[in-house]
Every structure is written in C-alpha cells, then in structure tokens.
C-alpha cells in the first residue's frame, strides 16, 4: 500500500446501512487494522443526554478510536444537512492531514447525499416564512401540511412521513422562496467535486427478517431495566423540551414520550418502537437503492470488516 501523495486526493470510506446492520462494530474492526478516525453520519448521535435510544457508541469504543460529530449539540438545538456537510469536509481534511483514514459511518442518508452532491441550489432558511408555516401547521396539523406538499412536490412528499414536520416545512419553504419544488432544485444542482476519493460501502441484509429480529432484540435491550424510559424521563424533567423538536422525534424517543404521557401501555410502546425502527430501516434501504455507485456487502455475512478491508486495500491509497 502506498501513502497518498500530497497532490492526490485522499481516500475516504463511507459505511452506510440501515439501523442494526452492524455499522459501528464494522468500523471499529477496520480501525484496528488501519489507522482511522470515525465521523458519525447520524442525526441522532449529535445530541448529548441521548445515549440509550440512539445506540450511541460506548465510552470504551470512543476511547479506542477517535469519534467525531457525537455529543455536539443540546437536545434543544437543530442540526442541518448544510452544517453536517461543512463539519464533515473540515474533519476529513484534518484526519487526512494526520495521515489517517476517515471513516464516514452512519445511517442518515440525507447527510450522505448532502455531502456527496452539495446543497448550493437550496436557499437559506427564512425565519419569518418558517414562522408562518409553523403557525399553519399548528392550526391544521402536519398530515395536512404533508398533503399540501404532495400536490406541490410529490417526489419530496413521497420520501417524507406525514409527521416529519421539520422536513415538510423546509420543503414548503423552498417552494415559496424559489417557486420550484425541492426535488427539481436538487436534480438540477451542479455536482460539487469532493476534495477526496469516496469509497461508498453499503451494508445491506440478504434476509430482511434477520434484520427485523436484530431490531427487536436491540429495542428490547434499550427497554431493559427501564433504561430508555429513564433517559426520556430525565429529558422531560428538564422542562424545556417538547415532542416537536428534531431530537425528540428520533425513533424510540417519540414513542417513549407518548408512553410517559399515558397514551398507551408498555407492550404497545414496545410494538410501536419496533415498528418505527423497522420503518426507518426500510426508508434507509430505499435511499441506498438510489445510490448506484455504492458497493454492497451483506451485513449478515461473516467477516464484513474483512470484505471492506480488501476493497480499501485494492484502492491503494490507504495510510499505513
């Protein structure tokens, strides 16, 4: 293996996949073989005080390999695709300058797309317009706003859930500001050339039922001894958080909040939490299928990390 020459673009590996596909364990195994640092590509892991429901890497795992973009925000705050792109580009440059391999690891596919394709075609947020849209949503509800979006931008509406208020509002905001649907703007946006060579790896299950079983096992582990519920109780006790925030809309947290509100019992919480996680995995796999450049590896196969390592080595650009 050769060191990347100063003029050549460094190699960066993205490890994408649905929830419970083993992305973290795979990245850690790769980092044992090649000097690496991990950049989290996860819209839930950015939040502090949210550890159990996000399946955040443990302190031991984070001590063994440097991790970035984890615990960088208070749950009261929001984090945009634009912010992620800026942070990721900066971190890749810093990690490469240290002679290490940057591993982009996660399941927030919109972040991967934003990093790869850029977002220059989309206008900045307009606070006054957003306030108007928020007021309208409070009046008629998020599903009605989703129906409105479906008439104006059916492509974007099709990939958003009716209760995904934040992204629905953003899509409507873009239409109002530009007169064009977000899907059209993204399609015509000039592709911005990345300052690195990207090796996109997708961990996808050969048997969807096995992934579903993993999801159920993991959610049960989160509920064990009241762990997730205690975490959400502590977040509620702060007094400044509410279910409409991006952080509290994360899978598992929304359902736990509703359970603590008395909306349903523990058995239904488990059922709803597992169903929501399975839906998330389905959406993640749909996103991945729209990335023809990805190199797919069965996340259920033995030695997933070894398969990826062979692909990295064949790229012949890795730090020693």
UniProtKB/Swiss-Prot annotation:
Binding site for substrate: 19-24
Cofactor list: Mg(2+)
Site, Interaction with substrate tRNA: residue positions: 108, 130
Residues given in the record as ATP binding sites: 17-24
Magnesium among keywords: yes
Region span, Interaction with substrate tRNA: 42-45, 166-170, 249-254
Segments crossing the lipid bilayer: none
EC number(s) per entry: 2.5.1.75
Keywords: ATP-binding, Magnesium, Nucleotide-binding, Transferase, tRNA processing
GO MF term set: ATP binding; tRNA dimethylallyltransferase activity
Annotated catalysed reactions: adenosine(37) in tRNA + dimethylallyl diphosphate = N(6)-dimethylallyladenosine(37) in tRNA + diphosphate
UniProt cross-references to Pfam families, sorted A to Z: IPPT (PF01715)
A Gene Ontology biological process term: tRNA modification
Similarity remark: Belongs to the IPP transferase family.
Subunit organization: Monomer.
Function summary: Catalyzes the transfer of a dimethylallyl group onto the adenine at position 37 in tRNAs that read codons beginning with uridine, leading to the formation of N6-(dimethylallyl)adenosine (i(6)A).
Protein name as it appears in the record: tRNA dimethylallyltransferase
Upper taxonomic lineage: Bacteria, Pseudomonadati, Pseudomonadota, Betaproteobacteria, Burkholderiales
Gene it is expressed from: miaA
């Amino acid at each position: 293996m050769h060191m990347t020459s100063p003029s050549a673009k460094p190699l960066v590996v993205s490890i994408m996949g649905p929830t419970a596909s083993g992305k973290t364990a795979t990245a850690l195994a790769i980092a044992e073989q090649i000097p690496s640092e991990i950049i989290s590509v996860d819209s839930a892991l950015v939040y502090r005080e949210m550890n159990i429901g996000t399946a955040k890497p443990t302190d031991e795992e984070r001590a063994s390999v440097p991790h970035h973009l984890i615990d960088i925000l208070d749950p009261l705050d929001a984090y945009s695709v634009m912010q992620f792109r800026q942070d990721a580009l900066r971190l890749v440059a810093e990690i490469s300058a240290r002679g290490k391999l940057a591993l982009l690891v996660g399941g927030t596919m919109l972040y991967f797309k934003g990093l790869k394709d850029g977002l220059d075609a989309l206008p900045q947020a307009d606070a006054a317009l957003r306030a108007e849209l928020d007021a309208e949503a409070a009046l008629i509800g998020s599903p009605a706003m989703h129906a409105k979006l479906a008439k104006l931008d059916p492509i974007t509406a099709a990939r958003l859930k009716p209760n995904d208020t934040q992204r629905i509002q953003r899509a409507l905001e873009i239409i109002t500001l530009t007169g064009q649907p977000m899907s059209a703007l993204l399609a015509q946006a000039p592709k911005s050339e990345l300052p690195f060579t990207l090796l996109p790896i997708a961990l996808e299950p050969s048997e969807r039922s096995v992934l579903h079983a993993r999801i159920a096992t993991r959610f049960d582990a989160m509920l064990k001894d009241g762990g997730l519920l205690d975490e959400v109780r502590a977040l509620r006790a702060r007094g400044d958080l509410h279910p409409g925030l991006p952080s509290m809309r994360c899978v598992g947290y929304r359902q736990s909040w509703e359970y603590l509100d008395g909306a349903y019992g523990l058995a239904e919480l488990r059922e709803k939490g597992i169903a929501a996680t399975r839906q998330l995995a389905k959406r993640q796999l749909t996103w991945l299928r729209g990335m023809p450049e990805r190199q797919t590896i069965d996340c259920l196969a033995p030695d997933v990390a070894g398969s990826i390592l062979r692909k990295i080595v064949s790229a012949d650009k890795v730090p020693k």
